[in-house]
Amino acid sequence: IWTPSITVLEIQVGLRIMPAGKKQTFLSDGFEELLNRIQHRIAGFGEESARLAAGLTAERQKKGRVGELRDTMVAGIVLTHRARLATRNSSHFDDIEAVVINPWSA
């Protein structure tokens, strides 16, 4: 299992805006432990991902569809690695040529 670097960003932001306390500390520590375990399985957003995300953004805009930039960046990473994507927000990725799985509805 891999995770896109954009997901690391999203989770880090969520943890940093949480009120300080036991829950925030528990979740932050757990996430750091997870990152240490998968450190070589974090897919970065590089030039190829940027080009693919730009193409997707342009196609969406031509169709009048506006997407969240972070989701489009994740899509670029998924397309670069020809990967499958597990997400709760499967409708955000219904126009990419990749297998998208919603584990919450399976």
Predicted regions and their residues:
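PIN-domain endoribonuclease scaffold, especially VapC-family toxins
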Residues: 1-76, 95-98, 104-106
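Short alpha-helix at the nucleotide-sugar/activated-sugar donor binding site of glycosyltransferases
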Residues: 79
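C-terminal structural segments of small proteins and small subunits
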Residues: 88-92
